[in-house]
């Protein structure tokens, strides 16, 4: 594994990595994270009883929109034309948590790890925003890259 930081020049200045000589290949990234909430909040989400509306539906759209706009949020992130993206939710009533999984796909010269991570993060923040009136103790956490496929560095599995 190459441990060299790529977003700095030899003087320590931040730069956007030059990907012009890289090959376009299919790249896939999967990220995940959780929102822990009270059992009452989880039940309100499951029964679509949150006053602001369909929590998971809105969070799904927000996460996908975030993936498409990642380069506007992360300064050195390249803009990419995402070819596929999804946000999925798994509610675990025993743990009182919602697991969010974001998948991002592209055929490009650079990967989409940041897009998947941003999708999870914004979906989680949207859940928090929509439910904060009933539960201010929600905890967003465990956001990480699960899998990366394609590109020069090959496959990564957490």
Swiss-Prot record:
Its EC number is 4.6.1.17. One of its GO terms (biological process) is Mo-molybdopterin cofactor biosynthetic process. InterPro entries: MoaC, MoaC_bact/euk, MoaC_sf, MoCo_biosynth_MoaA/MoaC, Mopterin_CF_biosynth-C_dom. It catalyses: (8S)-3',8-cyclo-7,8-dihydroguanosine 5'-triphosphate = cyclic pyranopterin phosphate + diphosphate. It holds the Pfam family MoaC. Keywords: Lyase, Molybdenum cofactor biosynthesis. It comes from the Bacteria. It is an enzyme of class 4 (lyase). Substrate binds at residues 76-78, 114-115. The keyword Lyase applies. The active site is at residue 129. One of its GO terms (molecular function) is cyclic pyranopterin monophosphate synthase activity. Pathway: Cofactor biosynthesis; molybdopterin biosynthesis. Belongs to the MoaC family. HAMAP family: MoaC_B. Catalyzes the conversion of (8S)-3',8-cyclo-7,8-dihydroguanosine 5'-triphosphate to cyclic pyranopterin monophosphate (cPMP). Homohexamer; trimer of dimers. This is Cyclic pyranopterin monophosphate synthase. It comes from Clostridium perfringens (strain SM101 / Type A). The gene is moaC.
